[in-house]
């Protein structure tokens, strides 16, 4: 008996993939330079089937990786060549929508945007909005604690998930809820990148759509001036739904790709979106425009319609893909710095460009200090890829040096596990490992992700006997 | 002072009791390192420890099965770092929320948590969270927490999260420790996201017959920061909604029109954010709950999180609530199961085993002996 026999007993033939050509479809997620062909792919349709696969993995000592839509940017869904890839794409039912409770219950394969689409006509929406929201799955959002441009005001996935049904790495189906008295296991599970189990049912909070939404595009001569405007807006006590910034190189790329029509010669553009009750939005918009003018903005455009708003966002949302127009290859970085250090860190990135002869386009969620530097390189030029990799890593060092983080929303995955010891001590990582061992003592759930070196769980230590120390 | 550690230790007395259990000693560490030294010594001696802050909720949840050392964090009351431009603050866990509010107000900022007891500390607010009205808008303590420094039962100092508002590196131990009642270790330092103090505030209050009357407010686009109900055992039920921001007055007036009545005030009603009396129970219910005779309920219609007093038989009330509602006896004497169903309890037990295998950290304060 092998794990294959067991899987073939659980699933009909069309939902177990062993054909090498078809397996290669799943060899990477959105981070394409890490690839591995899974040993086998299964397509469960129910939590019971997920539990059965996971139990089979436990029985045969085989690792497993869960995958939603495969849009992740840190290799969190990178398969194991010795493991089972559990793809949730067939679990895409919206199980219930209850507007009195302002809740929806959905399966993990449902796309982020599908939740909003299901309730939009009634005036509700699901707040977290990662750029990939048209295709990314809510199960993946839970694993990665996904953010998005609007998380500045509304928070991340973890602030919007109220309960989960999970399959633990032992194959048990367990519910964890914010209503459970005791440890916030829900908060620990969201963002654990698939290392604590697989979410099979997700209860999300629905929010009433704001009465008014307005979007402002402000152009600046320099990125420093744009940064000053951001600080002043936040300092004035205004909390916009989103504050996004792009530098000249990112603007150039977006223009080439989607003709977004941002003001020519801008050294930086800010996109500020305000939402809420109409009187608040109107007074805040006037204040934000005044701040932008005072900090040197030479042009401001306010979207007068939903179409104009979409046009302003188009340049920003296409920015990652757009750099493909101005560079043969690029690395998308994801670091965070305290907002007050933005200027210093951008100067540091500038210095790195000069030192290594590598161009960096900057796109960022300026309101919360989340940088997405796009490190551009020519993969056919000898040594350039390596230099780009060094620059990318040095940017993370800058973030850590300024008290920030190595990832704001893309996750650690396989990509940044090696950077974890730069941000955390061994004691910190060992303590996190205790959580891992509580959920997954066998280390079968998405092994090799998040943590730099595999740690064995061992037995729960036995009670020590000793004498009181010298304090007591 | 004992030994070379210089940590202040005194004998425990009845005033130091946790749910009636009197500790043998009280330790008063003044730094993170001293917390670690004390816990290391307790590990050597096999001593049971319960952390305490403002002691406002020590009577909540179950008493510890055993208690040798009350670890009093009230001497750790410093603001370690406050960068106003980042809207972030890092504090020692023993600082009171009132003191922190004073410091932050000087910069026109606040930690947007409504804490029901004066004297409650940050550590206690995390370890034993209490619901506050504005959780609807700003979230609970766990939602505003960015980073944490904890000390484990063996004295290990560990950090998680950070001091930026957006960060997904590593497990969020801060959230795990939220609601832990001292059973996983000691929360020694915490970092929070702050908010600017609102330019203006208005409360709309109105008396009502049923709980559903307030639904129109939640379906509106007026964005109240809180919608609270005060349902006394006898007398009229009152609903109050808070509006914040420069246009608070306009929105409160608009809300009055939506409801067809009510009064707008510049101050909160006297019962706002205050728990009803003992015996005290926590009720979570997302639809209008059945409320038994003689029971008073206060809390958020918007989040479905309430505190209730006057209930004697928890099981009887539970049987009248929806299946996904939760009723837990917090403080006082109850008949019936204090905890009710907690589907994730087996997982909590496994976490407890990994963090505190010797069961020395506040053993038995939570359900199932956790």
Residues covered by each model-derived region:
Chain A
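Activity-critical C-terminal alpha-helical subdomain
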Residues: 417-472
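FAD-binding subdomain of flavoenzyme oxidoreductases
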Residues: 93-97, 103-246, 463-472
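Alpha-helix capping/hinge segments and adjacent helical runs
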Residues: 12-13, 400-412, 436-437, 441-448
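Conserved, mostly hydrophobic/aromatic
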Residues: 57, 194, 440
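C-terminal substrate-recognition/cap domain of FAD-linked oxidoreductases
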Residues: 18-26, 207-208, 214, 219-391, ...
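N-terminal flexible segment immediately upstream of the FAD-binding catalytic core
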Residues: 1-55, 72-102, 131, 248-259, ...
């Amino acid at each position: 008996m092998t794990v294959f026999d067991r899987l073939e007993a659980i699933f009909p033939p069309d939902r177990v993939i062993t054909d090498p050509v078809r397996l290669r479809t799943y060899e990477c997620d959105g981070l394409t330079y890490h690839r591995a062909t899974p040993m086998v792919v299964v397509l469960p349709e129910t939590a019971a089937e997920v539990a059965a696969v996971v139990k089979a993995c436990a029985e045969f000592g085989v690792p497993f990786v869960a995958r939603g839509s495969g849009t992740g940017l840190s290799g969190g869904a990178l398969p194991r060549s010795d493991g089972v890839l559990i793809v949730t794409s067939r679990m895409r039912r919206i199980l219930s929508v209850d507007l009195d409770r302002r809740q929806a219950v959905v399966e993990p394969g449902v796309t982020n945007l599908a939740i909003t689409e299901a309730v939009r006509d009634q005036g509700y929406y699901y707040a977290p909005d990662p750029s990939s929201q048209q295709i990314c799955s809510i199960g993946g959002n839970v694993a990665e604690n996904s953010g998005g441009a609007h998380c500045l005001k509304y928070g991340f996935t973890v602030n919007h998930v109220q309960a989960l049904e999970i399959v633990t790495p032992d194959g048990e189906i367990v519910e964890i809820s914010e209503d459970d008295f005791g440890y916030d296991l829900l908060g620990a599970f969201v963002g654990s990148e698939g290392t604590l189990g697989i979410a099979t049912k997700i209860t999300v909070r629905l929010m009433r759509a704001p009465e008014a939404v307005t979007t402002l595009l402000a152009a600046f001569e320099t990125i420093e001036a744009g940064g000053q405007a951001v600080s002043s807006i936040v300092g004035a006590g205004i909390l916009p739904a989103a504050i996004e910034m792009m530098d000249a190189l990112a603007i150039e790329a977006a223009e080439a790709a989607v003709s977004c029509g941002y003001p020519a010669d801008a050294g930086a553009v800010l996109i500020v979106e305000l939402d809420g009750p109409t009187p608040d939005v109107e007074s805040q918009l006037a204040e934000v425009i005044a701040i932008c003018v005072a900090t040197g903005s030479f042009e401001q455009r306010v979207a007068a319609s939903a179409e104009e708003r979409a046009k302003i966002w188009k340049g920003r949302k296409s920015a990652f893909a757009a750099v493909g127009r101005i560079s043969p290859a690029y690395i998308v970085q994801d670091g965070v710095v305290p907002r007050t250090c933005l200027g210093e860190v951008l100067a540091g990135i500038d210095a790195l460009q000069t030192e290594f002869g590598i161009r960096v386009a900057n796109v960022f969620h300026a309101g919360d200090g989340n940088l997405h530097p796009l490190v551009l390189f020519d993969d056919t030029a000898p040594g350039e890829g390596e230099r780009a990799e060094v620059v990318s890593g040095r940017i993370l060092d800058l973030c850590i040096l300024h008290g920030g983080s190595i990832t704001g929303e893309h996750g650690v995955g396989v990509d940044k596990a090696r950077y974890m010891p730069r941000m955390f001590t061994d004691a910190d990582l060992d303590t996190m490992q205790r959580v891992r061992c509580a959920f997954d003592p066998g280390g079968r759930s998405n092994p090799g992700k998040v943590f730099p070196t595999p740690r064995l769980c061992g037995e729960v230590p036995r009670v020590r006997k000793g004498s009181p120390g010298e304090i007591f | 002072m004992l030994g070379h550690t210089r940590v202040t230790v005194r004998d425990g007395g009845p005033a130091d009791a946790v749910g009636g259990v009197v500790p043998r000693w009280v330790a008063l560490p003044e730094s993170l390192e001293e917390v670690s030294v004390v816990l290391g010594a307790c590990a050597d001696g096999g001593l049971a420890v319960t952390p305490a802050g403002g002691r406002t909720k020590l009577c909540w949840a179950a008493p510890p099965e055993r208690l040798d050392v009350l670890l009093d964090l009230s001497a750790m009351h410093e603001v370690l770092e406050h960068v106003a431009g980042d809207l972030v603050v890092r504090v020692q866990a023993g600082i009171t929320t009132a003191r922190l509010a004073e410091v932050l107000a000087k910069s026109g900022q606040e930690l947007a948590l409504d804490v029901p007891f004066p004297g409650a500390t940050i550590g206690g607010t995390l370890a034993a969270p209490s619901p506050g009205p504005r959780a609807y808008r700003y979230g609970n303590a766990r939602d505003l927490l960015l980073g944490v420094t904890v000390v484990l039962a063996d004295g290990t100092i560990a950090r998680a999260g950070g001091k930026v508002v957006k960060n997904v590196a590593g497990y969020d131990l801060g959230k795990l420790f939220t609601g832990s009642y001292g059973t996983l270790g000691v929360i020694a330092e915490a970092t929070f996201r702050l908010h600017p103090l609102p330019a203006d505030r208005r409360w709309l209050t109105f008396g009502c017959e049923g709980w559903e009357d307030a639904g129109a407010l939640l379906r509106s686009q007026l964005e109240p920061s809180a919608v609270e109900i005060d349902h006394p055992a006898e007398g009229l039920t009152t609903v109050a909604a808070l509006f914040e921001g420069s246009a608070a007055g306009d929105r409160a007036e608009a809300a009055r029109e939506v409801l067809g009545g009510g009064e707008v005030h510049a101050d909160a009603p006297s019962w706002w954010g205050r728990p009803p009396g003992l015996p005290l129970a926590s009720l979570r219910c997302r639809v209008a709950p059945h409320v038994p005779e003689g029971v008073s309920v206060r809390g958020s219609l918007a989040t479905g999180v309430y505190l209730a007093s006057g209930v004697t038989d928890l099981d009887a009330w539970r049987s009248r609530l929806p299946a996904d509602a939760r009723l837990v006896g917090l403080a006082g004497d109850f008949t019936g199961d204090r905890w009710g169903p907690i589907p994730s309890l087996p997982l909590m037990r496994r976490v407890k085993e990994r963090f505190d295998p010797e069961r020395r950290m506040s053993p038995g304060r939570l359900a199932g002996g956790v």
